[in-house]
Amino acid sequence: MSTDDPVDDPYAYWKRNFLLLILDSTVFMTAVSLSDVSILSVFLVKATGSTFLAGVFQMVRVTVFFIPQLLSINVGGKPYKKRIFVKWTMVGRCCLLIAVLATFLARDLHLIVLSFFLSFALFPLFDGFTVVPWLEYVVKSIPPPKRGTFFGLSQGLGAAGMIASGFLITLILNAPHLIFPQNYGTLVLVEAILMLTGVGFLLYLREAPDAATTDDTRLLDLLKGIPRIIREDEMVRRLILIQLLFSCYSVSTPFYALFAVTQLGVNEGQVGFFIVYQMAGRLVASFPWAHLCNKGHNKQLLQSTGLLMLASLLLALVAGASYAADAPGASLLIPLMFFLYGAAFSGMFLAVNNYVLGISDRQQRPILLGTMNALYVVTSILPVLGGIIIAYLPYELLFVTSIVPVVGSLLLASRLRQTLD
């Protein structure tokens, strides 16, 4: 199917593209939950005995995902966006097969661990190159009144798929004929199959070219202009600081599952249910989040997600003492903790990106999107810090380390404008 469609209306194919993008987003989100940080942190600690290595693993995944987004900020002048993100999507998703092949063909556990590092470094690396052109494609292909619905529906259907994958994770990890580490390799195999299925949907997208494009702007010149944009726009500066402070949740949340297994006595085979709880939160929250996005109430969305993340961290903080004292209702703390985390995580993605879409024009938009997302690299070291903390200090200190900056992000969010013009 050609991407070169000479039509004047950029939204001419919006219904077709809306459906295909929703289908790919659903299978993508379902697939990535099979290698959620909660799952792979347990795998790595079981394979290596090192919480530090588990933190490094998450740091690598985050860093290599966000840096390419800064290198993609020159897509605003490109007439076609589909060919850019589809190319990188195909390459990245194929990289998952490295871990699959090593798990079932190699006998050395160290080699298998190395293959997981390689697969989950290359996949997010190439996937990072898709984010800015994908968002640009969404903006040019889907009318503004439908974008909140699109993002909300993507989150909702994806969360439903993730709930199903949570049960699948539990089934695979408890399968008597799948021993460690083949059970984790099977999870990645299913993930790869789903990912490659999604590529088929992307190939049938249609795209009208942008008018009056300027492809001659050098990437280096765009990068040099980023400090000026940040310096001159107070809202951008505040949004960056809010995002950085909020992201400090990642000191703690990668270790939620490990905390439940090692400190609260939850069976390892039950970690799949953690994904179910987390994705149930995303599913339930997707409807109010979509409504707020359509109305442009991004300040309210930021504040809501911050409060939910704070509540999740506070529940984690009291869970240890509650379980030790066998307090009434203690067994509900873990499901609620993951539920609130899932709801908050999806809301922050929508709120920040909708703010950027609302305050920038076509030329500035990819620059801001790439910059905002690349700043997550600053906080990518936080899971390593979390791994060090729990190696020597109580989990309670770990959770406090996240709670304080999240409170700071809430205070800053109160000073943002309620709606965008």
What role is predicted for each listed range?
Residues 206-225:
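Flexible cytoplasmic inter-helical loops of multi-pass small-molecule transporters
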Residues 41-46, 73-77, 100-107, 162-182, ...:
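Transmembrane alpha-helix termini and helix-breaking/packing motifs in multi-pass membrane transporters
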Residues 2-68, 72, 158, 235-275:
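Helix-loop boundary and gating motifs at the non-cytosolic
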Residues 51-52, 142-153, 268-269, 362-372:
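Loop-to-transmembrane helix entry/capping segments in MFS-fold secondary transporters
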